[in-house]
Structure formats: C-alpha cells, structure tokens
Amino acid sequence: MALSQSVPFSATELLLASAIFCLVFWVLKGLRPRVPKGLKSPPEPWGWPLLGHVLTLGKNPHLALSRMSQRYGDVLQIRIGSTPVLVLSRLDTIRQALVRQGDDFKGRPDLYTSTLITDGQSLTFSTDSGPVWAARRRLAQNALNTFSIASDPASSSSCYLEEHVSKEAKALISRLQELMAGPGHFDPYNQVVVSVANVIGAMCFGQHFPESSDEMLSLVKNTHEFVETASSGNPLDFFPILRYLPNPALQRFKAFNQRFLWFLQKTVQEHYQDFDKNSVRDITGALFKHSKKGPRASGNLIPQEKIVNLVNDIFGAGFDTVTTAISWSLMYLVTKPEIQRKIQKELDTVIGRERRPRLSDRPQLPYLEAFILETFRHSSFLPFTIPHSTTRDTTLNGFYIPKKCCVFVNQWQVNHDPELWEDPSEFRPERFLTADGTAINKPLSEKMMLFGMGKRRCIGEVLAKWEIFLFLAILLQQLEFSVPPGVKVDLTPIYGLTMKHARCEHVQARLRFSIN
C-alpha cells in the first residue's frame, strides 16, 4: 500500500508512455533518408526525443557546436526538433563545401523567420538559388560597386565611398566633441550607427538622413530587434508551435521588418518621382535604369516592384555589419590603450597631421589593418554564415548529405581553431603581420572567416572592409578613446545573427588635434 502511494504513475500509464516513446522513435527513424551503399551518415550525438539538441545548443550555439566538433569531427549532424542540421567546422572542410562543391551547398533552407524579411523576397535570405537569383545578385553587386568603390569623376576623393565616409567621419568627430562638452561620455554604438547609416543612405539614395529623422534613427538604433531573431538555430524555425505562443521577441522582429520595409518602400517611391535616366547618381537609380532596358523574359532584368528587395538587402547589411565592427573596434581600443597608441603612432608617421587619411593610405598602414583583422577574428561577431542548404544529394568527406539539408557553417570555430591560430583566445594584431612588421601576412589573413565563402559570399565584403578602415583611420587620427578609471568594459559577445558587446555608455574621446 505504501509503495503504491509513492509511485505517481500507474503501470498502465507507464506502458502507454513507453509505447508512445517507441512510436515516436521509430517514426523519426523512418523519416531519415536512406543512405546509399558504400556511404555513411555524418556522426550525430545523442539528442532528446522531439527536442533533439536544442537544449545542448543553449544560449551560445557557436560555442556548443565548436565543442561538439572537437569530439565528432568537421562534419556532424544535429537535430533541432525533428529537423536534421548539418554542422560544418574547420576551414578546409568549409572551403570544400562552399567553394569546390559550391553548387551543391549554395541553397538556403526554408526557414520561418526568413519569410518575414522583405515579405520572403530577400536576395540574401530567400530559398531561391537559380539563374534569376544569380542574375539579380550580379546586378546588385555591380550597382553596389559602381556607387561605392568605383571612382567619382566629379570629386577629388578616390571613390564615392571615400567621399561619403570622410564627410560622415568629420561630422561624427564634431558630434562626439559636443557630447564631451555636455554629458562628458557617450555610447559609441548609438553614435556610429547614425554615421554608417548615412553612408549607405548616400550610396543607395544619394542623400544623407537628417539627424531630426526620428523614423530612420529608430530603425538603425534598434537593429537588435532583427539580429536576435534572425540568428542561426532559433527554435522558431524548427518548432512551428512556438509561432502561435506569446513571444515578445517575435513580435518585435515582425514589427521591425514591417517598419523597415515600409520606410524603404516610401524612400524608393520618392526617389522614383525624381528619377532621371540621364543622371543616375546612386544604387537605386542604377536599378531603376536597369529595369527600363527591355523585356525581362531572360530573368536578367529586374521588375521595378522588386527593386526595394535588393535595396533592403544592401541597406540592411551595409549599416549593421559595419557599425558592429567599428563598435567592437572601439571597445577593444579602450581596453587595450597600448594598441591604440601603436595605431596612432603609425598614423602620425605615415599621414601626419595636415590631412585626413585616404583609402590609398591603406597599404602603408599595416598595423591598423592587422588590428581590424584581429577584431574580426577575435570577436567573430558573425559566428555563423546565414544557413545554407544542399541543392541536391551530395557527399562531403565521405558522408552522404541529402538534398534540402539545412547547413550551419561555424565561422567562430574557424577563427578560434588552435590548429590555425596560436593562442586563439589572445587578442594580438601582430599575428597578421609579416615577420618584419611592414605588411599583412596575406596567406594567414585569408584564413580569417567573417563574410562567408563561395556563391553566397557577402557582396558587400570589399565595401565593408574599406569603410571600416577609413572610419577608424580618421577617428583614431584625431581622437583618443578611453573609459574613466574603474569602469569595466564587458566584451562578452551577445549571441545573434551579428553578435554585439554589452552597451557601454561611459566611453570618452579626447581631441588629439583638429584638421580644417
């Protein structure tokens, strides 16, 4: 009698639960694709029924999957819910998949959160990877290059990007001086994001946004509402029931995407009212002109209604990635003043104090370039590429990978792989310099991974690197950044599509000298 009272379940209930467990197990096993003879499935750690490995991933999936790769290898499989996910680690394996077998791995999985971005029409996130997608990607790449890194015949600057960044960096220095004269401190992210958004706004629309534009400021200062939900491994993409439960983060994500799309639609429409095909001055204008060239049957031309989708991808990626990189750079500099002094010594020696840095100075500033590369590597603020998927049945390192398999590419693991990097947890820009310290060690720099690889490599990679370099060169030439004694700076990354550091509102900037 006492024993029966201590057991909360009856024998019948236990048998029923066991039967259900076995049924679920066999159903899930039956859903697994048949592996062709002579091949094998990737190794898979034990996971919970129905849940898979979602609990194992925790709050930092990039770290959890890096630990798994140490035990199970470069190619492993996990399950999030009932969905199999291939996880790729280590540089050689990732390069084999995304470059040498690029056509096999160029797809995107059909994820719920991706359908909420630009109404599911995003060039970056959509599942499309066919000829029309490839043609539009080339079009976006060409338009971006034309109004960023190409030369501007009407300007003394080397290119449009240099002109826009120089103007915005000068305005940012003035704004930081005003803040130092007032409150005496500032949050660098909130200040940098406005300047970076103005640069991409000038390239996309030929205009800078006024500081009084509350609409624009609200969007660019709240990108965390996007990156926290668009991250790899979000349970929303793998457990459909979660979409119908109260979820403040999902509601913020939906609202942000709707506001952002509406803002861009309105801006593009206003731009169209003034469009002159004989005077194309920005990316949107170039897309308008291309849309009017003739029939679209080949897929090489883009309908006007699709232009906003391309602009959304270019604008969105153009300010978040660059802002995050510059913000991380400033956080490293205030915690490592000796590195800041080395950069400023290099700037003083190469450029002096009579003019501002230019993009042409980049080869003569190897230590600054090494610092930027080390910031990319150490923070790995893009821990995963946007998820890939396989476009057909394929093999990788002897493992069978079925068509439409979701693929996570762990960039953080590559950037912290002890086989590639000596003391990977240490922040040391010198690792990227040649032995004599006069140039970048190019073979090593090419092992750092932040912008993806292959057919889905970020189209704005060159633009981002040039922009980050020029912003930092101009800022560090004229300003010295610090935090007051006793203020602790938290450099722990906060997981998301792009990982941010904890906000720091106590950064200070002292003017070294001014340039008219």
UniProtKB/Swiss-Prot annotation:
Its membrane topology: Peripheral membrane protein
Cofactor: heme
EC code(s) of this entry: 1.14.14.1, 4.2.1.152
GO biological process: aflatoxin metabolic process; alkaloid metabolic process; cellular respiration; cellular response to cadmium ion; cholesterol metabolic process; dibenzo-p-dioxin metabolic process; epoxygenase P450 pathway; estrogen metabolic process
Effect of E168Q: In allele CYP1A2*10
Superkingdom to which the source organism belongs: Eukaryota
Pathway entry: Cofactor metabolism; retinol metabolism; Steroid metabolism; cholesterol metabolism; Lipid metabolism; arachidonate metabolism
Keywords per UniProt: Endoplasmic reticulum, Fatty acid metabolism, Glycoprotein, Heme, Iron, Lipid metabolism, Lyase, Membrane, Metal-binding, Microsome, Monooxygenase, Oxidoreductase, Steroid metabolism, Sterol metabolism
Cross-referenced InterPro entries: Cyt_P450, Cyt_P450_CS, Cyt_P450_E_grp-I, Cyt_P450_E_grp-I_CYP1, Cyt_P450_sf
Effect of mutating R431W: In allele CYP1A2*6; not detected when expressed in heterologous system as it may be critical for maintenance of protein tertiary structure
Binding site for heme: C458
Single GO term (MF): estrogen 16-alpha-hydroxylase activity
Coiled coil (residue ranges): none
Pfam families cross-referenced by the UniProt entry: p450
Catalytic activity reported: an organic molecule + reduced [NADPH--hemoprotein reductase] + O2 = an alcohol + oxidized [NADPH--hemoprotein reductase] + H2O + H(+); 17beta-estradiol + reduced [NADPH--hemoprotein reductase] + O2 = 2-hydroxy-17beta-estradiol + oxidized [NADPH--hemoprotein reductase] + H2O + H(+); 17beta-estradiol + reduced [NADPH--hemoprotein reductase] + O2 = 4-hydroxy-17beta-estradiol + oxidized [NADPH--hemoprotein reductase] + H2O + H(+); estrone + reduced [NADPH--hemoprotein reductase] + O2 = 2-hydroxyestrone + oxidized [NADPH--hemoprotein reductase] + H2O + H(+)
SUPFAM superfamilies (UniProt xref): Cytochrome P450
Stimuli inducing this protein: By nicotine, omeprazole, phenobarbital, primidone and rifampicin.
Effect upon mutating F186L: In allele CYP1A2*11; drastic reduction in O-deethylation of phenacetin and 7-ethoxyresorufin; has a Vmax of approximately 5% of that of the wild-type and 5-fold lower Km value
Any single Gene Ontology cellular-component annotation: intracellular membrane-bounded organelle
Subcellular location, record wording: Endoplasmic reticulum membrane; Microsome membrane
Impact reported for G299S: In allele CYP1A2*13
Known tissue expression: Liver.
Quaternary assembly: Interacts with PGRMC1; the interaction requires PGRMC1 homodimerization.
Function description: A cytochrome P450 monooxygenase involved in the metabolism of various endogenous substrates, including fatty acids, steroid hormones and vitamins. Mechanistically, uses molecular oxygen inserting one oxygen atom into a substrate, and reducing the second into a water molecule, with two electrons provided by NADPH via cytochrome P450 reductase (NADPH--hemoprotein reductase). Catalyzes the hydroxylation of carbon-hydrogen bonds. Exhibits high catalytic activity for the formation of hydroxyestrogens from estrone (E1) and 17beta-estradiol (E2), namely 2-hydroxy E1 and E2.
Family to which the UniProt record says this protein belongs: Belongs to the cytochrome P450 family.
Name of the protein in its database record: Cytochrome P450 1A2
Lineage: Eukaryota, Metazoa, Chordata, Craniata, Vertebrata
Gene: CYP1A2
